[in-house]
């Protein structure tokens, strides 16, 4: 088992995002040809995302802000904010993954080089492989179901209105977006509007899958190495010949894992920040939209609410898992039989213990930690915003 065995769902996400899959020195598969059709779909999807972000704001400026009743104004504002955040966070993933592609491939190459090949009894490779693949599979299926539901909802609503004569055809797209052509009352215009949002969300969801699965993969790789270091420290006997060399190797390996964690933090900083801000606003505004809008719109924004809750939770959960895994090194070093070693051995172990005193933690631009505590604070603040906005009705 090697690192490339973990790449199944990341490769599927890359295929959906219409970008080449990640390749590094040592990966057995050759780089696949990046077809011009994929480039066209990627560029078209990115343009559609940018247009949708702009169109949502223009639609609200031309229509939503003109509402005379407070309840209608709040509903239009919440609908605009939730749609804007959904598209904006997706575009942030496109930007972060595209601009950091070389750094990601370099990081994957380093992880490939240090992937356990010897002394496998200290590394639970199969355990962490199964956990990572299970989570990535669930995420992939969830985003695919969400994508199909989100983009098919306008067609189902239109079909329902067509079959029931008491309803007028609303021609409502996935989001309230301004288009430079006629949408309401035009089958062609409506189809083009739905298709443009569908293409944009196709690329956006693909990048979201890549982002989430990359964070999952990198998290469990760090956990694997922290767990391996802890296991080797517990089993290390200072009386055994060569113990000093083994300990020095573990100290160097621990230092390298900390550096790799910093690289992950630097690469994903923009993702962490956009998810924190976007999820806080979107969870609040989606909840308001569910409360104030009609049933069909409520179901649509409920799916967006669930997506943001899960999206932010996965990121914060992975950050907590890295912190907990790094915290195992200190007790493992302490329970080593250091008291039977010589002075040099004790000093070396003390250096490792001092370095591992504070568990490693990802931070969003060195400010908010990426943890479940931050996730709960996000939900709390979103609820406070929700009660404030809800009271305006």
Swiss-Prot record:
The atypical heteromeric and topological design of the odorant receptors appears to be an insect-specific solution for odor recognition, making the OR/Orco complex an attractive target for the development of highly selective insect repellents to disrupt olfactory-mediated host-seeking behaviors of insect disease vectors. Odor-evoked OR currents are independent of known G-protein-coupled second messenger pathways. Residues 1-39, 98-139, 211-269, 326-365 are cytoplasmic. Keywords: Cell membrane, Membrane, Olfaction, Receptor, Sensory transduction, Transducer, Transmembrane, Transmembrane helix. It comes from Drosophila melanogaster (Fruit fly). Odorant receptor which mediates acceptance or avoidance behavior, depending on its substrates. The odorant receptor repertoire encodes a large collection of odor stimuli that vary widely in identity, intensity, and duration. May form a complex with Orco to form odorant-sensing units, providing sensitive and prolonged odorant signaling and calcium permeability. The chain crosses the membrane at residues 40-60, 77-97, 140-160, 190-210, 270-290, 305-325, 366-386. GO terms for cellular component: dendrite membrane; plasma membrane. The gene is Or69a. Interacts with Orco. Complexes exist early in the endomembrane system in olfactory sensory neurons (OSNs), coupling these complexes to the conserved ciliary trafficking pathway. It is found in: Cell membrane. Pfam families: 7tm_6. This is Putative odorant receptor 69a, isoform A. GO terms for molecular function: odorant binding; olfactory receptor activity.
């Amino acid at each position: 088992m090697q690192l490339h065995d973990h790449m199944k769902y990341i490769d599927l996400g890359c295929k959906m995002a219409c970008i080449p899959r990640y390749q590094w020195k040592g990966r057995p598969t050759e780089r696949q040809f990046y077809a011009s059709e994929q480039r066209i779909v990627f560029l078209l999807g990115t343009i559609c995302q940018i247009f949708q972000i702009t169109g949502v704001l223009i639609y609200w400026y031309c229509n939503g802000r003109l509402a005379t009743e407070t309840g209608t104004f709040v509903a239009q504002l919440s609908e605009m904010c939730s749609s804007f955040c959904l598209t904006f966070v997706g575009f942030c993933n496109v930007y972060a993954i595209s601009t950091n592609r070389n750094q990601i491939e370099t990081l994957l190459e380093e992880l490939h080089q240090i992937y356990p090949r010897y002394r496998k009894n200290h590394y639970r490779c199969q355990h962490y492989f199964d956990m990572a693949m299970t989570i990535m599979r669930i995420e992939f299926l969830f985003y695919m179901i969400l994508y199909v539901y989100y983009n098919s909802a306008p067609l189902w609503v239109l079909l329902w209105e067509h079959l029931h004569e008491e309803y007028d055809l609303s021609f409502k797209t996935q989001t309230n977006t301004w288009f430079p052509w006629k949408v309401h009352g035009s089958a062609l215009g409506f189809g083009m509007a739905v298709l443009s949002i569908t293409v944009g969300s196709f690329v956006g969801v693909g990048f979201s899958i890549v982002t989430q699965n990359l964070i999952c993969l990198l998290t469990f790789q760090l956990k694997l190495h922290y767990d391996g270091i802890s296991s080797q420290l517990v089993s290390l006997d200072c009386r055994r010949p060569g113990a000093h060399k083994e300990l020095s190797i573990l100290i160097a390996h621990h230092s390298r894992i900390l550096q790799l964690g910093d690289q992950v933090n630097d690469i994903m900083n923009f993702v962490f920040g956009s998810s924190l801000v976007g999820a806080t606003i979107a969870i609040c505004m989606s909840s308001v939209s569910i409360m104030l809008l009609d049933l069909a719109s409520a179901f649509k924004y409920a799916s967006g609410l669930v997506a943001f809750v899960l999206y932010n939770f996965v990121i914060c959960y992975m950050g907590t898992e890295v912190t907990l895994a790094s915290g195992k090194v200190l007790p493992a070093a302490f329970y080593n039989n250091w008291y039977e070693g010589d002075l040099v051995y004790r000093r070396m172990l003390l250096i490792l213990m001092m370095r591992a005193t504070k568990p490693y933690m990802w931070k969003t631009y060195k400010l908010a930690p990426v943890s479940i505590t931050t996730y709960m604070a996000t939900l709390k603040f979103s609820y406070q915003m929700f009660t404030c906005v809800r009271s305006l009705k």
